[in-house]
Amino acid sequence: MAKHLFTSESVSEGHPDKIADQISDAVLDAILEQDPKARVACETYVKTGMVLVGGEVTTSAWVDIEEITRKTVREIGYTNSDMGFDADSCAVLNAIGKQSPDINQGVDRSDPAEQGAGDQGLMFGYASNETDVLMPAPITYAHKLVKRQSEVRKDGTLPWLRPDAKSQVTFAYDDGKIIGIDAIVLSTQHREDVTQADLIEAVMETIIKPVLPAQWLNKDTKYFINPTGRFVIGGPVGDCGLTGRKIIVDTYGGMARHGGGAFSGKDPSKVDRSAAYAARYVAKNIVAAGLADRCELQVSYAIGVAEPTSISIETFGTGKVSEEVLIKLVRQHFELRPYGLTAMLDLARPIYQQTAAYGHFGRDIFPWEATDKAEALRADAGL
């Protein structure tokens, strides 16, 4: 492979689409805390002065949708009407109904192990050894930049920052190996009284330099900090937000394929979410075991059917064993039926709100990031 560039982007927790994702997952967590067997599909729409929460839920739990919504918005940092969006004054509309009984009869089984998939679909999981968290570097560092923006905003280091922000990082590769960072874009909402010069200096010294490894930066690296020159109007005032619109930010930054299904607001019976987590778990363990430098796994399902309709693996020429052997090892060591993968990763619990900003993958706080199968995989592969 010749020299090439690859770019990924991320957005902060205050981005309108991420506000929506976090509200949807906060509602999901509140329900799962009371009823781990609940069926939840929660969608959120945010715009100036209002939040609409809708979807389908089947549960014995009762949760206060309005209070959950306000608390989530408050924690993100929209606490002042000057921003055009305020946790205490925004309208909260609740349009949640019940899940279709036609879906229930396809999913629920007398034997839990035979629980059918909640929908048809295809999901991908990916891992690469180019970072210590076995994730692609572009998305990893794009997340780190907006996470740092949030930290210095909240701890008072840069009190004039506002919650909405976006990052983009372009890495240069030679023969598949990182040789540097070609370009960095960071746009952050700010208070009106901050000059462009002060903002550029503060972002460079307080956000970019502490996050990006110095050995990847050079005299040719290009920096674009608030390139429009002004970012005062942001959040839901600037753009409406909707659950599930940042699926590439949520996963691998475009480095791997995506089946199209969003994650936030969905309980683990929805394989869009749970099987994508399981696929990441499988791919990460294959790479951690040294069976490949890069691994992408696809799994697919039919609604109401427990067994996956297909499993396939791509190692991009980096595999130490054949892909047929890898698939056999996957079937031997991992449970990919909906009930089994939920149990394998302990997914029927309130862990989802923290996934809804800064990436679902590459953070060791989540069970699908464990590499506890790597040793057994390596042994059974004969390496």
From Swiss-Prot:
Main location: cytoplasm
EC number: 2.5.1.6
Entry GO CC: cytoplasm
Pathway(s) of this molecule: Amino-acid biosynthesis; S-adenosyl-L-methionine biosynthesis; S-adenosyl-L-methionine from L-methionine: step 1/1
Family annotation (InterPro entries): ADOMET_SYNTHASE_CS, S-AdoMet_synt_C, S-AdoMet_synt_central, S-AdoMet_synt_N, S-AdoMet_synthetase, S-AdoMet_synthetase_sfam
Positions in coiled-coil regions: none
Binding locations of ATP: H15, D164, A165, K166, R230, F231, D239, R245, K246, A262, K266
Entry annotated with the keyword Transmembrane helix: no
Domain of life the protein comes from: Bacteria
Keyword field contains Ribonucleoprotein: no
Segments of this protein annotated with the region Flexible loop: 99-109
GO biological-process terms attached to the record: one-carbon metabolic process; S-adenosylmethionine biosynthetic process
Keywords: ATP-binding, Cytoplasm, Magnesium, Metal-binding, Nucleotide-binding, One-carbon metabolism, Potassium, Transferase
Annotated binding of L-methionine, by residue: E56, Q99, D239, K270
Catalytic activity: L-methionine + ATP + H2O = S-adenosyl-L-methionine + phosphate + diphosphate
GO molecular function list: ATP binding; magnesium ion binding; methionine adenosyltransferase activity
Pfam family, any one: S-AdoMet_synt_C
Residues that bind K(+): E43
Binding site for Mg(2+): D17
NCBIfam families: metK
Subunit structure: Homotetramer; dimer of dimers.
Family annotation (HAMAP family): S_AdoMet_synth1
Function, in words: Catalyzes the formation of S-adenosylmethionine (AdoMet) from methionine and ATP. The overall synthetic reaction is composed of two sequential steps, AdoMet formation and the subsequent tripolyphosphate hydrolysis which occurs prior to release of AdoMet from the enzyme.
Stated name of the protein: S-adenosylmethionine synthase
Organism this protein belongs to: Shewanella frigidimarina (strain NCIMB 400)
